[in-house]
Curated annotation (Swiss-Prot):
Protein name: Probable Xaa-Pro aminopeptidase SNOG_02267
Pfam families the UniProt entry points to: Peptidase_M24
Positions of the UniProt region annotated as Disordered: 607-658, 670-704
Source organism of this protein record: Phaeosphaeria nodorum (strain SN15 / ATCC MYA-4574 / FGSC 10173)
A GO biological process held by the record: proteolysis
Alphabetical UniProt keywords: Aminopeptidase, Hydrolase, Manganese, Metal-binding, Metalloprotease, Protease
Compositional bias per record (Basic and acidic residues), positions renumbered to this chain: 638-650
Length: 789
């Protein structure tokens, strides 16, 4: 245990004052990266007593033509002996004595050279001319350092073994999750995505290499990395993927069926053969074993199995091995070192027959502390077979084409584990399931490992106490409250228009809409259809309407070629349903329109009378036109009133009727307006609504007992002057007034609406509802009788 004295503590506080935060929780050498131990090992391999090693780290840089940083990957040789992003962190986290900035290295080298009395060399990895150390007249060796470091890196210390074991644990959990979900997937990209998801959630953001998710024939390509094809009817998936934890790698491969059981006898046979190759080779692992011998053993087992399956024939095991035909199905080596690199360094290839220099250890024999992979495989590469082995008479005579064609759909099978060589045997660091355990996980559909949080099925789901603690991403402090770490639930409300959208990724909210007046805007097609209804006249009709005395038009005609304004009683015909009307495109009746315009002018004249009470309107000529043939008095009176020279009495008995009829005639199609203003109520006016009140009069003579709501269909006609208006007979106007009088009394403050009579298809109607103020001084009956007289 390191003891902090006053001097060292003061030095650390000095670093803190400069803005560096020192991690006092990592004080013991066992918790630090063993950089000193690695340096002593390199010194031992170099066989020197004194010297200086110069290594430069990776320089951070941006992407070309961009201000965004490029992915940073520290140089492994540099990291092996030092590492660390800042001076303070390097001093505390890594087992070193002194730390300097790069621009201070040159001065340090000069001081070292003068104090060493030329007794040591300066060791570099590369040509010193390419390094920034300059010329210090010191002897520089750029040849010996890399081989020595390669040999040193082959043997892992306890700290490195711990990191590699951690990387294997995370990768094994990811493989388990893939197995438990493989029956849900249909594409290679989904497999890769889930694997990366699990690794990142366990603080292993970087992968040791690009994952290989090869299905079917793609498994015959050793370094396939497209990972984007559908499974279809393919049989197997070969997943070669391993994460990196604190720069130390893992390398794991599993091959599994894309169904709950082996899809074919051929697939099961090849898997059992590869499984036997790996098991027998792993059992032979021990210190002092030459790894090349295990590679040869794997080939012999493969040849025996291929002969038994009938893929190879016409030769003995020795003949086929000497011819090299087995490499058509097992083309790579049995394994490699693993450490800071997925294919970690060594003095020579792991399966090389040559030995190293006398000063260096032999590289092809296993030693305690090595971590190697054992990854046999059998592949059916159509490209390699067609272009190299089948055209060659040396190999083609041993290959049975008839049997080979049955095995081509298998693609390839590889099984790979990371093995630590111990003092007497080995330890398998990989815990990813294989064999029967693998099939059981696929069949169950779950892995029994809480590697990733279960997906929240609803934003309202309460988190129970039995849920495992959430995993923290890199950089999140352990003291962060759990409430902050919990995933944010998606919004629990949505527009009412979208409630019917059923999606697994969007949870509908069954409550009220946030927008009280929300209405969906019309689409382009709807706008075009609406414009055509308003502007394009047509004589086509799809409604079979039988004229009836119950539905009488304003003009007195019930022709079907035009759209009339009807006067109907307040009740719906029996047996009709609301909302059953169909939109029709018909030209408006000119006579109905002219009558409505005339009534509108009358309303305007009556409303102007309120502004000038002293001027009274004489309405008797209008009503007495039935007996007097002078039409000119009506038109002149209307024109005179519109100019505003005269006004009606404020309480004219015609006020409410004129206002009501004009409002009914002039409201636009499908318009929805608010309630009448106070001024409108005082004037006896009305505004159309989607809904009306169904009031029943207490009197038995009231024909408006069942007045119902209506919808507006009549388009807004023009209110400009029409010459034909002057030629209207007073008889037609009088008939309209008398018809309204016969439909019911004029008492009360009522409302009327113009629109399509609900339950009667295609009938725009003037509904004489009981919310229409007609008179204050007398009844319509009295006025009509005086007009008749």
């Amino acid at each position: 245990m390191e003891v902090l004295d006053a001097t060292s503590l003061a030095e650390r506080l000095k670093w803190e004052a400069k803005g560096y935060w020192l991690h006092f929780e990592a004080e013991t050498p066992l918790e630090k990266y063993p950089a000193k131990q690695h340096a002593r090992r390199v010194q031992e391999k170099l066989g020197i007593e004194e010297g200086l090693i110069y290594l430069s780290g990776q320089q951070a840089r941006n992407n070309e033509d961009s201000d965004m940083p490029a992915p940073f990957r520290q140089l492994r040789y540099f990291y092996y002996l030092s590492g660390g992003p800042t001076l303070a962190e390097a001093l505390v986290k890594y087992d070193v004595d002194e730390v300097y900035y790069s621009d201070e290295v040159s001065d340090y080298i000069i001081d070292w050279y003068h104090h060493s009395c030329n007794r040591g060399k300066l060791y570099t990895l590369h040509d010193p001319a390419k390094s920034p150390i300059g010329n210090h007249h010191a002897p520089i060796d750029s040849v010996s350092l890399q081989p020595a470091m390669n040999v040193a890196r082959m043997i892992k210390d306890e700290h490195e073994i711990k990191l590699i074991r951690k990387a294997n644990d995370i990768s094994s959990k990811a493989h388990r999750e893939v197995l438990s979900n493989i029956l849900k997937f249909t594409n290679e990209a989904q497999v890769e995505g889930l694997f990366l998801d699990v690794c990142v959630s366990h603080q292993a953001k970087q992968q040791a290499y690009d994952p290989i998710a090869a299905s079917g024939p793609n498994a015959g390509t050793l370094h396939y990395d497209a990972n984007d094809e559908d499974f279809g009817k393919r049989q197997l998936m070969c997943l070669d993927a391993g994460c990196e934890y604190e720069l130390y790698a893992s390398d794991i491969t599993r091959t599994f069926p894309l169904s709950s059981k082996w899809p074919s006898k051929e697939a099961a046979n090849i898997y059992r053969l590869v499984e036997r190759m790996q098991e027998l080779c792993i059992k032979r692992l021990a210190p002092g074993v030459r790894y090349l011998d295990l590679h040869i053993l794997a080939h012999q087992i493969a040849i025996d199995g291929l002969l038994a399956l009938g893929i190879l024939h016409n030769g003995t095991k020795e003949e086929i091995y000497k011819a090299g035909t087995s490499r058509a199905f097992f083309p790579h080596g049995l394994g490699h070192h693993i450490g800071l690199e997925v294919h970690d360094v060594g003095q020579a290839e792991l399966m090389s027959v040559r030995r190293g220099k006398q000063v260096l250890e032999q590289s092809s024999h296993l030693e305690e502390g090595m971590i190697v992979t054992v990854e046999p495989g059998i592949y059916f590469s159509v490209y390699a077979l067609q272009h190299f082995y089948l055209p060659s008479p040396v190999h083609s005579k041993y290959i049975n084409l008839e049997v080979l064609n049955r095995y081509l759909p298998v693609g390839g099978v590889r099984i790979e584990d990371d093995i630590l060589i111990t003092a007497k045997s080995y330890e398998n660091l990989t815990t990813a399931p294989k064999g029967d355990e693998m099939l059981e996980i696929i069949q169950r559909g779950r892995s029994n490992v809480n590697s990733i949080p279960a997906r929240r099925q609803s934003g309202r789901t309460q988190i129970t106490e039995d849920e495992p603690p959430l995993l923290r991403a890199p950089g999140i402090s352990a003291s962060t409250p759990q409430s902050i770490l919990r995933p944010i639930a998606r919004s629990s409300t949505m527009p009412a228009e979208l409630k019917q959208d059923k999606s697994v990724d969007f949870e509908p909210f069954e409550g009220p809409s946030l927008f009280s007046n929300f209405r969906r805007s019309m689409t382009t097609d709807e706008k075009i259809q609406r414009w055509q209804q308003d502007h394009i006249p047509t004589t086509a009709t799809r409604i079979n309407l039988t004229p009836s005395s119950q539905y009488k038009s304003v003009c007195g005609s019930n022709t079907r070629e035009v759209k009339h304004v009807y006067m109907i009683s307040g009740s719906f015909p029996p047996g009709t349903a609301r909302g059953a009307l169909r939109e029709q495109i018909l030209p408006a009746c000119k006579q109905c329109t002219i009558l409505c315009e005339t009534l509108d002018r009358l309303r305007q004249s009556l409303s102007m009378s309120k502004e000038s009470p002293e001027a009274e309107l004489d309405v008797s000529p209008v009503i007495s036109q039935k007996q007097i043939r002078n039409r000119r008095s009506v038109s002149s009176t209307a024109r005179h009133d519109l100019r505003g020279d005269r006004e009606r009495p404020q309480h004219s008995p015609m006020t409410g009727l004129a206002n009501g009829l004009s409002a009914m005639c002039l409201e636009p199609l499908n318009h929805v307006s608010e309630s009448p203003t106070p001024s409108q109520r005082r004037a006896g006016g009305c505004t159309p609504h989607w809904r009306g009140q169904n009031r029943a009069d207490q009197s038995g003579d009231d024909a408006l007992r069942a007045a119902q709501e209506t919808q507006i269909l009549q388009s807004k006609p023009s209110v400009r002057s029409n010459p034909a208006t002057d030629q209207l007979s007073a008889k037609a106007v009088s008939d309209v007034l008398l018809e309204l009088q016969r439909q019911g009394p004029a008492a009360g403050s009522d409302r009327c609406t113009l629109g399509k009579q609900e339950g009667v298809e295609g009938i725009p109607a003037i509904s004489r509802a009981k919310n229409f103020h007609v008179s204050t001084g007398g009844s319509m009956v009295g006025e009509a009788r005086r007009a008749e007289e």
